[in-house]
């Protein structure tokens, strides 16, 4: 049997866009191929409260009917309203006719508002028995020990560096036991803060991987389920995966929100130096603007490093010193501040001035501000509200500080793109003389290990 895996990147609630995308993939496929699309491919996801909107369901029906007019064989995902219950569904279309529907039974956090469905569905197709449904319902289906010639799963799997390895490790013994090949189709792309990794695949009945689509890219691949060739993986390293995920997050955020220009502050530190590389990779150097905002506490090497970071990438950049604005603010606040020892108030004021200037520029030129706070700082609240926490999207929001350094070294493996001094110098907010992050925080090597245990492995031991 010929099956086409169609790994697409839909836009949430943009039914017209998603319809055209699905239609294009269907028309590109062979006439006699069954085309498989990811979960909620017609509506996009996550849907959250929008699944209760009448417009969501009206458009779902409208565009599903238009897809049926193509007179092809395919499986696609959409929300349906069945007797007043909203279900996450997969529709099996054969030659323009709806032949079967699988509704999701084991719901996850993205399925808020959906009712429990019935799980896997079995259908006869071209003299073969096909079981199709959602990845979350697969274990329950396999326990029934029903015999099928092919299993088809649609999914929306979130990216982590270990996602694919963990999925394959979990799935292989189950497929060997079932002695049934499986096609798994996963969406790719980013939606707000969520990254979907793609990496759809075809696994043989002995658990060997036969075909795999790329990480993070829209891609289609036709397979013959009767062929048993084994696929040899060439996996990316952990940091390389994280790099491409971060680039995709920026790229899709700007594309899906119809924003062209990105703006960010360049401090000469490692975080902004990494974010500007990610932004240029995602948007092109012509669409990225840097702003240096030095203060009286900024070291000369910070300014030099910030300029080198911009010039190495060929982006447009400006220098706007904040000393005069800071002095004016202190003068305005002197009736309250006078006679009191300088403290965090003066430090945060500088950060807020920078945030104000950056947001002012972003608003004036129609750009979106990129936040450069890393996951370590974010997790412990090491930042200034309305200052360095400003931004439309946090490019490093899921990347620990130690990984920021490792990713920067990986980027520089062939040539110096990120200034070496930004990588090796001690991190500092430079809001007071000789300030270092370690004045307030443990060494990042220690902090990140603690944060990883709590945030990534749910370790609790009070």
Descriptions of predicted regions:
Residues 1-265, 281-287, 292, 317:
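Enzyme catalytic cores with a strong preference for nitrogen-chemistry domains
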Residues 126, 179, 205, 231-268, ...:
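ATP/NTP-dependent adenylation/nucleotidyl-transfer catalytic domains that generate, transfer
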């Amino acid at each position: 049997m010929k099956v086409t895996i169609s790994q697409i990147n839909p836009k949430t609630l943009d039914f017209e866009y998603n319809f055209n995308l699905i239609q294009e993939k269907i028309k590109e496929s062979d006439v006699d191929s069954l085309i498989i699309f990811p979960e909620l491919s017609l509506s996009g996801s996550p849907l959250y409260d929008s699944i209760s909107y009448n417009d969501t369901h009206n458009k779902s029906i409208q565009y599903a009917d238009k897809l049926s007019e193509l007179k092809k064989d395919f499986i696609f995902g959409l929300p349906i309203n069945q007797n007043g219950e909203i279900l996450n569904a997969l529709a099996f279309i054969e030659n323009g006719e709806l032949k079967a529907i699988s509704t999701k039974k084991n719901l996850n956090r993205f399925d808020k508002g959906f009712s429990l469905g019935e799980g896997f569905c079995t259908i006869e197709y071209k003299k073969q028995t096909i079981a199709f449904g959602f990845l979350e319902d697969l274990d329950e289906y396999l326990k029934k020990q029903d015999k099928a010639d092919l299993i088809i799963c649609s999914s929306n799997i979130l990216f982590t560096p270990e996602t694919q390895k963990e999925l394959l490790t979990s799935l292989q013994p189950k497929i060997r036991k079932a002695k049934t090949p499986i096609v798994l189709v996963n969406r790719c792309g980013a939606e707000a803060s969520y990254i979907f990794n793609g990496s759809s695949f075809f696994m043989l009945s002995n658990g060997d991987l036969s075909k795999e689509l790329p990480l993070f890219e829209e891609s289609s691949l036709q397979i013959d389920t009767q062929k048993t060739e084994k696929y040899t993986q060439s996996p990316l390293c952990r940091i390389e995966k994280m790099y491409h995920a971060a680039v995709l997050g920026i790229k899709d955020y700007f594309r899906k929100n119809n924003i062209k220009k990105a703006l960010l502050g360049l401090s000469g530190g490692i975080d902004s130096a990494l974010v500007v590389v990610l932004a240029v990779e995602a948007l092109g150097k012509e669409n990225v603007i840097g702003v240096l905002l030095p203060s009286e506490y900024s070291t000369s090497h910070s300014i030099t490093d910030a300029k080198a970071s911009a010039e190495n990438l060929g982006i447009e950049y400006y220098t706007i010193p904040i000393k005069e604005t800071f002095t004016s603010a202190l003068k305005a606040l002197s009736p309250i501040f006078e006679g009191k020892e300088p403290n965090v108030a003066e430090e945060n004021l500088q950060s807020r001035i920078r945030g104000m200037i950056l947001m002012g520029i972003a608003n004036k030129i129609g750009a979106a501000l990129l936040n450069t706070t890393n996951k370590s700082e974010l997790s412990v609240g090491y930042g200034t509200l309305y200052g360095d926490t400003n931004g439309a999207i946090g490019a490093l929001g899921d990347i620990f500080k130690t990984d920021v350094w490792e990713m920067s070294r990986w980027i520089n493996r062939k040539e110096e793109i990120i200034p070496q001094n930004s990588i090796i110098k001690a991190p500092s907010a430079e809001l007071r003389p000789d300030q270092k992050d370690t004045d307030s925080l443990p060494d990042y090597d220690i902090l990140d290990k603690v944060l990883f245990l709590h945030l990534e492995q749910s370790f609790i031991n009070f």
